[in-house]
């Protein structure tokens, strides 16, 4: 058709050989051997090729699932310690995505079940970081939900379906991608039952939320408003099947170690009672390793909810040595991050060993784990980061223990000059 029109016009007016638009209807017309293509058709062809390449890459990445050892090795680059938790997570995630690859095969009588994960560990021990690193490694949609904001449907607060809505937002509302994603629900211990005895008052943010999460975690078809709109009866919903979404729940479970110790410690009174000193008490991390489902039920989780989280991983408390490693060794270690910030100003940043030890000790005193390290360094480096951009002759900043303790200012080394004496901070 286009060739005929071109022939009739005797070459005076040119047309795209693909869409038939004339040279006046498009911005650019590219000539080939007896054919023409417009800029719009070129863009369309590029989009088609790009989509096919992305689909092929997604399929190849799905088949190239890293082994548990490889997963654990990559986690080692970002998370210090917690070897047992890494091993449990690596095996669970590997089996989960192996199960997803298996579901496409027909004539298979064995149906593999889903194994969701429960992470138990003190605050700042690396629960959220482990989940984030896993999602980045596997290149799947990932979202973090806060269990403390969830309430039963009909009450003020977030419905459990909002979790799936957040997951959809992470993948531009691609339902197929979302159905293979990972959801991390933080502070799961905060929705424990407030009391062992049933009450006439509704526990809308405790046991009620656990009941609402049951079907979502096990596998159901959740109805989610498109593009984050509010629910109303005349609206069409996106249907998301949660059977293949991996749920990882994490919490500090403060006080759980006492429940475990009460179960594992022989009681007694009188002359035959076993006498124990305070020094014989176990560390929190050691006690948590002995956790059993009954302990979680006594803590306040309902038995059905515990049953939906068959894979259990406990994290240890971080000691001073581990905190120093966290400051220096991971790919995105805090000292490397601040060194990069100073490098952008053309300044070297050096942390002395005694300074790192002092930072770790202060974090232990605050009982915030690795999460408290950044706030300590921010406070220490605030004045220096304020002054450095205004000084062009500083070549190096040195931080030692006295700077962390607040008894002196950072040592500034200037270009082509002797370093100035330290000056005590202003009162």
Curated annotation (Swiss-Prot):
Cellular component terms per the entry's GO annotation: HslUV protease complex
Q: Sorted alphabetically, which Pfam families does this protein's record hold?
A: AAA_2 (PF07724), ClpB_D2-small (PF10431), zf-C4_ClpX (PF06689)
**Which GO BP terms, alphabetically?**
cell division; proteolysis involved in protein catabolic process
Signal peptide span per the entry? none
Q: Which keywords label this protein?
A: ATP-binding, Chaperone, Metal-binding, Nucleotide-binding, Zinc
State if Glycoprotein is listed as a keyword. no
Superkingdom of origin organism: Bacteria
Named from the GO MF annotations, one term is: ATP-dependent protein folding chaperone
Q: Report residues binding ATP.
A: 122-129
SMART domains registered for this protein in UniProt: AAA, ClpB_D2-small, zf-C4_ClpX
Residue ranges occupied by any ClpX-type ZB domain in the UniProt entry: 4-57
Record keyword Signal present: no
Give the family per the record.
Belongs to the ClpX chaperone family.
**PANTHER family tied to this protein:** ATP-DEPENDENT CLP PROTEASE ATP-BINDING SUBUNIT CLPX-LIKE, MITOCHONDRIAL, ATP-DEPENDENT CLP PROTEASE ATP-BINDING SUBUNIT CLPX-LIKE, MITOCHONDRIAL-RELATED
Instruction: Give the multimer and partner information.
Output: Component of the ClpX-ClpP complex. Forms a hexameric ring that, in the presence of ATP, binds to fourteen ClpP subunits assembled into a disk-like structure with a central cavity, resembling the structure of eukaryotic proteasomes.
The protein depicted here goes by the name ATP-dependent Clp protease ATP-binding subunit ClpX
